[in-house]
Amino acid sequence: MSHNSFGHLFRVTTFGESHGPALGCVVDGCPPLIPLDAAEIQAELDRRRPGQSRFTTQRREPDAVRILSGVFADDRTGGRQLTTGTPIALMIENVDQRSKDYSDIRDTYRPGHADYTYEAKYGIRDYRGGGRSSARETAARVAAGAIARKVLPGVTIRGALVQMGPHAIDRARFDWAEVGNNPFFCPDAEAAARWAEVLDGVRKDGSSLGAVIEVVAEGVPPGLGAPVYGKLDADLAAAMMSINAVKGVEIGDGFAAAALRGEENADEMRPGHGGAPSFLANHAGGILGGISTGQAVVCRFAVKPTSSILTPRASVTRDNRPTDVLTRGRHDPCVGIRAVPVGEAMMACVLADHVLRHRGQVGAHPAGAHPAGADPAGTHPGGPGGFQPG
């Protein structure tokens, strides 16, 4: 097993390397009859695309996506391109590789990168931009996430950068409307202005910063997830940890919950509308016992500082000789910025998988168990969010 796939019923396989001819993904298990065109996928890829500001890598990749399979359109569909229920293959060509930038490290391991571990495992490594361990691999995840969102009617998934290096946002100023107004996906306008100054200094020094990203899914129905080894939060944690450069994940209050007393941490309930309880808080991040509560699902993950920096660092060569390394090439001074849409995509893929798994195990949701207008269990042949022509 090569471990390049994740998910059970909504299954995603990614392929390709940073400096190869192309990368992409195959999504297997997407229900049929869902309208899908390349423009919808492209819109998500454009949010992650490199070279859009001075605060990201200046590698110029258009990330133009092609749908190779799994969709069909003719006069019977009214000209609409629909999913067919077969594997959806997506491809994104690499067009701005500069592999010569990496020739001086072909026989040297970069500290903080996966150079040594890949070679220790496989006996060979693609040193050009890190190969498959590069953050470029995440473009394929974002493409898959765009399809996953189509399986989640009534669910809104949003992400934000809430900390850069030691500089956190002020929660009192958290405003989702600000996320699209700055190059950091930051929900705090004042923090974004400070971060620009900080990151300019870091770039000038040839260094980098880490970050914390928060992803929130609203409209998630109760009942997703299965005890004990199919917990929703366990799958979310695994999905976020699989993103290159991620070093920590928390759900809800996460590690901060350890500092609370029991009466502070428990999310009290009162009678709500439609027979469902109303929660007075959401310390649990929308998941209890590994099963969604119907509240917003809240996940945060920490991204380490980019290891590709201009500061010389001690390392060794392939034949175990001491050397110093500095990394040339084009790199993100804070890779966490472009990790925001990646986190959203992984949230979408995990939720889509759990929606389909729930439907397969218990059928439709109990009455009132999902928001009005949502069809997470799929009540028509087209499945969740599907389109039934005619």
From Swiss-Prot:
List the record's Gene Ontology CC terms alphabetically. Answer: cytosol
Q: For this protein, what reaction is catalysed?
A: 5-O-(1-carboxyvinyl)-3-phosphoshikimate = chorismate + phosphate
E.C. number, please? 4.2.3.5
Chain segments carrying region Disordered: 362-390
Q: Alphabetically, which GO biological process terms does the record hold? A: amino acid biosynthetic process; aromatic amino acid family biosynthetic process; chorismate biosynthetic process
Disulfide bonds, paired cysteine numbers: none
GO MF entry, a single one: chorismate synthase activity
Cofactor(s) this protein requires: FMNH2
Pathway named in the protein's UniProt entry: Metabolic intermediate biosynthesis; chorismate biosynthesis; chorismate from D-erythrose 4-phosphate and phosphoenolpyruvate: step 7/7
SUPFAM superfamilies, per database record: Chorismate synthase, AroC
Q: A Pfam family in this protein?
A: Chorismate_synt
Q: Give me the stretches of Gly residues compositional bias.
A: 380-390
Q: Where does NADP(+) bind?
A: R48, R54
| Note on cofactor | Reduced FMN (FMNH(2)).
Q: Which CDD domains match?
A: Chorismate_synthase
Q: Does the keyword Secreted apply?
A: no
Q: What class of enzyme is it?
A: lyase
Q: Give residue spans, biased composition: Low complexity.
A: 363-379
Q: Which domain of life is it from?
A: Bacteria
- Give UniProt keywords alphabetically: Amino-acid biosynthesis, Aromatic amino acid biosynthesis, FAD, Flavoprotein, FMN, Lyase, NADP
Similarity comment text for this entry: Belongs to the chorismate synthase family.
HAMAP family tied to this protein: Chorismate_synth (MF_00300)
Tell me how this protein assembles: Homotetramer.
Q: List, alphabetically, the NCBIfam families matched.
A: aroC, PRK05382.1
Q: What does this protein do?
A: This reaction introduces a second double bond into the aromatic ring system.
What is the protein's name according to its record? Chorismate synthase
Species, as recorded:
Methylobacterium sp. (strain 4-46)
Task: Please name the gene that encodes this protein.
Answer: aroC
